[in-house]
């Protein structure tokens, strides 16, 4: 079970979370930092990078006072108020110990990690005060990344099992999301996917019956509710469908979180702490055949077109183009080819200028900025006649720069101008879901 920053954002919401995790099952619970805390810790780090010690200490004291207020509200006994005040004080002393003139990214990572330390200690102590059989598990004892900054799956599995074996008879285990050790043994974080990724990795490592991701939204919706009215939650998604939606813009879940659960074949449920009886969305390896599930949009896309007569009947041309993107570690979202041209889209403009300069060796390069990918997701196997034509018909009045279909049985994507995004989402909703 994973609960995000909003779900543990106030003492009352922490109490609500406790009601959900004390359900009679043996639960491993992953918690994010309280909402707003990570931003405050980053602000403290910014002051220290600028060598503004006074500004950093002012922010530290202000944040600690805020937590002292949370403690007074959360606990009912003097014993646990005093115990948690002591623990929280030690965490803030750790933050202050990083406040020095030779401040580096190492100290920043230590500071940012304290948000999860605060939330997990507070919830664990509240559970103890309420008489529950609970154990706090330090994530730094089993979460680690390798030399490529990817999760070390073998290490995580082995060490999570070792730590859990030390406390075999507990009903609830609490641990931190997001944070880990890197290959050098330094405090670090998972970077992509955050606490959701931690929950998925741990669920796969221990063979959980299911992985629950609790947020303030009742599952994945069939369209973006910020732009389309009357969207509805999708009751079930295949792992690939969920990954496609997450990659192409569904903010409720990061695409990296799907992979560990999919490999271990463990269902993922997206649930709402504000409405815990809502069914949410279940993600599994089951496909609902011949059904379109949802639409998502990915913003800030750049389209690149290369036209070259040298490409005609030439082998190795695409390989050389791809090598440019590999060199600059830039992923391609969509690609279409013809006899004399290739078009592709990217969303990372970090190395756009050097990429374009190198691509000009191959032909005439044209760039369209401010584009958007609209992704339609479902069981879109090519043998299922008609679905692609329905999606295309919905966009008949909108200029389409590129279409990608066939790379996946679960996705058809349209590249359009960002200015047409809302109109496209609404039209697709009208055609597909009404």
List where the protein language model places each region.
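Structured core elements
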Residues: 7, 28-29, 173-175, 186-191, ...
């Amino acid at each position: 079970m994973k609960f995000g920053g909003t779900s543990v954002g106030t003492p009352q919401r922490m109490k609500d979370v406790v009601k959900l995790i004390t359900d009679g099952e043996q639960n491993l619970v992953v918690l994010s930092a309280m909402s707003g805390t990570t931003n405050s810790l980053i602000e403290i780090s910014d002051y220290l990078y600028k060598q503004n010690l006074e500004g950093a200490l002012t922010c530290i004291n202000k944040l600690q006072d805020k937590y002292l207020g949370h403690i007074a509200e959360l606990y009912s006994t003097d014993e646990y108020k005093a115990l948690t005040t002591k623990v929280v004080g030690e965490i803030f002393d750790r933050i202050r110990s990083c406040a020095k003139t030779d401040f580096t990214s190492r100290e920043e990572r230590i500071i940012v990690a304290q948000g999860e330390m605060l939330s997990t200690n507070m919830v664990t102590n509240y559970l103890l005060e309420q008489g529950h059989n609970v154990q706090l598990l330090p994530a730094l004892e089993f979460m680690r990344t390798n030399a490529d900054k990817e999760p070390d799956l073998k290490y995580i599995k082995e060490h999570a099992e070792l730590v859990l074996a030390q406390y075999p008879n507990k009903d609830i285990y609490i641990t931190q999301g997001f944070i880990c050790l890197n290959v050098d043994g330094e405090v670090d974080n998972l970077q992509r996917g955050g606490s959701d990724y931690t929950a998925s990795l741990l669920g796969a490592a221990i063979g959980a019956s299911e992985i629950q991701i609790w947020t303030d939204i009742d599952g994945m919706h069939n369209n973006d509710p910020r732009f389309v009215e009357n969207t509805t939650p999708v009751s079930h998604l295949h792992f690939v469908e969920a990954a496609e939606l997450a990659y192409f813009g569904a903010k409720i879940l990061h695409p990296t979180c799907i992979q560990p659960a999919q490999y271990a074949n463990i269902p993922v449920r997206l649930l709402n702490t504000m409405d815990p009886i809502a069914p949410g969305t279940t993600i599994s390896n089951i496909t609902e055949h011949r059904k379109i599930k949802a639409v998502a949009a990915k913003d800030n896309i750049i389209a690149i077109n290369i036209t070259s007569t040298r490409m005609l009947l030439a082998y190795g041309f695409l390989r050389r183009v791809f090598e440019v993107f590999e060199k600059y570690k830039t992923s391609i979202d969509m690609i279409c080819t013809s006899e004399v041209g290739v078009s592709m889209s990217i969303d990372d403009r970090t190395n756009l200028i050097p990429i374009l300069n190198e691509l000009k060796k191959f032909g005439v390069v044209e760039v369209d900025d401010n584009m958007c990918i609209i992704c339609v997701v479902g069981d879109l196997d090519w043998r299922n006649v008609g679905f692609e034509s329905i999606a295309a018909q919905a966009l008949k009045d909108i200029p389409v720069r590129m279409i990608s279909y066939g790379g996946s049985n679960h996705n058809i994507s349209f590249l359009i101008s960002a200015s047409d995004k809302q109109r496209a989402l609404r039209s697709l909703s009208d055609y597909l879901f009404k």
